[in-house]
A protein has these predicted regions:
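Alpha-helical scaffolding segments of alpha/beta enzyme cores, especially the outer helices
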Residues: 17, 21-28, 47-54, 111, ...
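Short, solvent-exposed turn/loop segments enriched in Gly/Ser/Thr/Pro and often Arg
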Residues: 37-44, 63-67, 164-165
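Non-membrane alpha-helical structural segments and their capping/turn regions in soluble enzymes
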Residues: 12-20, 99-110, 139-142, 146
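Metal-dependent polysaccharide deacetylase catalytic core of the NodB/CE4 family, i.e.
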Residues: 1-45, 76-78, 84-97, 128, ...
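Aromatic-anchored helix/helix-loop segment that forms the rim or "lid"
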Residues: 90-122
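His/Asp/Glu-enriched short active-site or ligand-binding loop at hydrolase and phosphoryl-transfer sites
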Residues: 4, 53-71, 84-93, 161
Length: 185
């Protein structure tokens, strides 16, 4: 994740080349071309979405959105889906930057969940949680991760999906709009 080299996209010499390199390296290693993109440090330029769409990327996780995916049109007219991403439920932000204890992260996640779970009876919601094994997986923190997921996954209708699964569900529910090229001025 986060590109081939972890550096802001606006500082690379050739953004299109970096994206293509990432896609090629991942496909060569896994045998499968990635469908999604999570860029370095949530950075983008005005051209990033266009380059990603050209490379066949179907969804991004770079935008700090609320709790529902959205279609975003590129200048080519192709739609890319922006999946929710959340800084409030991000272990680096909560524990390493804000210096909260692990139980605060759990409590925050459960409060967030209870709110969107109640709202989800009208429309589906996505609860994005960003976790890093070296941080949340530490022996003094892992029990809070378990408690969080045990509670969340015990509720009817809740699933734990990756980006591709969320994308497939979303496209089934809300197909991409017809491609429209933007008008040049």
């Amino acid at each position: 994740a986060h590109s081939f080299d972890q550096m802001p996209m606006h500082k690379v010499d050739d953004e299109r080349e970096v994206i293509e390199k990432c896609m090629t390296v991942i496909k060569d290693f896994t045998g499968k071309k990635p469908r999604g993109w999570f860029g370095p440090g949530l950075t983008q330029t005005y051209q990033t979405l266009d380059f990603l769409a050209e490379a066949g990327v179907e969804y991004i996780g770079d935008w700090v959105l609320d709790d529902q995916p959205v279609h975003v049109n590129t200048t080519s007219g192709k739609s890319v889906v922006a999946l929710p991403y959340n800084y409030e439920l991000h272990d680096i932000v909560s524990m390493a930057i804000q210096h909260h204890t692990s139980n605060v992260f759990r409590d925050r996640a459960l409060d967030y969940f209870e709110t969107i779970y109640a709202e989800s009876h009208e429309t589906s919601k996505v609860m994005a949680i960003a976790m890093h094994p070296y941080l949340s997986g530490s022996p003094h923190r892992i029990k809070y991760v378990r408690e969080t997921f045990e509670h969340v996954l015990s509720k009817p209708g809740v699933v734990c999906w990756d980006g591709e699964q969320i994308l497939d569900w979303f496209l089934k529910e809300q197909p991409a709009p017809k491609a429209r090229k933007s008008k040049k001025k």
